Structure formats: C-alpha cells, structure tokens
C-alpha cells in the first residue's frame, strides 16, 4: 500500500524484516507495506532475513580484497577504458566526458549479466552489451563473482515482486521491464580519507542511482550517507546481518515520484580500507520507462536537480538514457 503521508525529513534509515514475506501472503503484504513506507519517505532501508548466508557475504568481500590487492598493471589489463560497454576495472581518480564531474576516491571492478557468445545484441555491438573482461592474474575471479551474482540476483527479483505488491500492481508488471536485464555487480574499494574530511574529497560524490534499485553489502567501516529534504547528511552505518536497499531513478519514475530516489555519498573517515559490494537492478536496454501510477501528492516530490534525474513527464527508452549517463561519468574506449 502506498504511504498516505510522507515526511522527507528523516534522521535515520529504517530496517525492514523480510522474514514474514517468505512465510505467507499476509506476511508478504505486511512487508510490502513496510517497503512502501520506507521507499516513500527515505528512499533507503535496511533488510534483514534477506536469505543470503553470512558466508556468501564474507566470501564476496574477500573476493573484493583479493582483486584490489592485485598489482595495478594486472587490473589495468581489464580497464573499462579498453572497451565501450563499461565493464571491467575503474581506476581511482578517473572520470567520463563531463568536465564538471570531479573525481571520486575509489576504484572498482564491475560486471553485468553475462551474455552468450552468439547473443545478437553482443554481436551487433549494441551499447552496454559486451563480453566481461576477466583478469588473467586472478583466474578464480569469475566463479567467485558469479556465485554471489546468482544469489544476489535472485534476491533482487524477490524484492522486485515485493515492490510490485507495495504499489498494488499486478504480478509481473515490473518484471516485464527486465526481460533482458542489465543487472550489475560491482566490487568497490575506498582508500582511507582524513577523519576531519568535510566533503571536498569524497569516495563517492552526491548522486542518485540510475536503476530501479540497488542492494548493497557494506563492510564494518561505515561512510555511506543519505541526504534528507533539509539537506542534512544522515549516516547509514553498517548493521550486522543486514543489506541496504535504495530506490533508484527508475522506481521514482514508475511511481511518479511517490518513491524517492535519495541523493547519497561516501566519505571514508574510518582510517581503514573500505569495501562495499553494490548490486544494481537495471531494466532491459529497450524497456520503455514511464509512470505506472499517478502521484496523489505531486507537490511532495524531491527536487529533480541532478544530471542523474530521469524525466517523469514523457516515456523514454531506458538504455538510451543509461548509455548517455555512463558516457558522462565513466571513461570509455576512445573512438576515432
């Protein structure tokens, strides 16, 4: 059920227990209501009893540590600068074609849903469709990442069903836009920053996510912050046994702004190396995105003042906007 009253000034991020959703229909309805309340006020929420084993989460963090411990030349072998589909290694302090974007203090390795060798979109060179570049120096990276990918992807689709229920939509309504999803897994590493860092140098600058929603595993170091309507940065500290879910621009459009895609950032003041593992639920490239419900309170929508904001006043092909956004923020292979 959609939230009837929304207070976009918040001081903490709520926790949603998914356990009842795996029990029966009444539990699913209870959880869907809790998700709607969190998505319509904060745009961020923790989930517990999510179904991923603690060992699976520990394993993917160790995978991230092992990859980012490789020599730089081994990582640069799979630099996303060497391809035009934005998969591979993103070196810290690099950026895309927008001169106004400042560098982030991070490095990452990212993949999307693997494509078959005879995939027609891959063979046609369709934007954002390409083979994953795996580093030769870490031959077990592929099986380790794919083991986690398959499990977190399953959770993503279970959450998608709960979002459908929370909006009163028929089962499969949102899933139809994921017929050939571009879901993405990223291994992020943030070097330590000064404890008194005020915001000039950031691990990740304030942004919204250009997907449906994100499922984040974060380590014990903290640093993630979400901005409320008063412009205050609210900490999203690690909570044992939970994952963090945040609403992206696509869900904001689908709900006509009822669900809020909150601006968030990362400042690693811990003094330690910080790792986080986001999983992005991306619709199919060719999915048409437009509001699926009407906002009963259109005046109570967060301002759309970021380059990452998606339009709600006209339908659009998801992949076209996503490809333009990727070109803005990420380095890509030079085209003569």
Residue ranges, per PLM feature:
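Peripheral, non-catalytic segments flanking oxidoreductase cores
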Residues: 1-336
């Amino acid at each position: 059920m959609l939230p009837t009253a929304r207070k976009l000034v918040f001081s903490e991020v709520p926790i949603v227990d998914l356990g009842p959703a795996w029990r029966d229909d009444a539990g699913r309805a209870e959880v869907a209501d809790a998700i709607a309340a969190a998505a319509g006020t904060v745009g961020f929420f923790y989930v517990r009893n999510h179904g991923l084993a603690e060992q699976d989460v520990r394993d993917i963090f160790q995978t991230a540590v092992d990859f980012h411990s490789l020599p730089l030349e081994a990582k640069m072998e799979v630099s996303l600068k060497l391809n035009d589909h934005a998969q591979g290694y993103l070196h810290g302090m690099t950026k895309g074609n927008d001169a106004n974007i400042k560098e982030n203090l991070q490095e990452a390795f990212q993949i999307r849903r693997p494509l078959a060798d005879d995939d027609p979109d891959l063979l046609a060179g369709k934007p954002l469709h390409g083979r994953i570049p795996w580093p030769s120096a870490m031959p077990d990276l592929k099986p380790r990442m794919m083991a986690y990918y398959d499990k977190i992807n399953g959770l993503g689709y279970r959450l998608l069903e709960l979002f459908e229920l929370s909006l009163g939509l028929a089962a499969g309504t949102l899933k139809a836009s994921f017929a050939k999803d571009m879901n993405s897994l990223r291994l992020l590493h943030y070097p330590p920053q000064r404890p008194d860092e005020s915001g000039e140098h950031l691990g990740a600058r304030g942004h919204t996510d250009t997907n449906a929603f994100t499922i984040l595993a974060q380590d014990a170091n903290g640093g993630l912050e979400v901005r409320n309507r008063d412009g205050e940065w609210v900490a999203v500290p690690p909570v044992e046994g939970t994952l963090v879910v945040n609403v992206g621009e696509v869900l904001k459009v689908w709900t006509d702004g009822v669900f809020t895609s909150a601006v968030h950032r990362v400042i690693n003041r811990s003094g330690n190396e910080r790792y986080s593992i986001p999983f992005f639920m991306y619709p199919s490239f060719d999915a048409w995105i437009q509001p699926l419900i009407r906002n009963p309170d259109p005046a109570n929508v967060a301002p759309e003042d970021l380059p990452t904001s998606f339009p709600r006043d006209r339908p659009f092909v998801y992949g076209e906007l996503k490809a333009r956004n990727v070109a803005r923020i990420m380095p890509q292979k030079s085209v003569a």
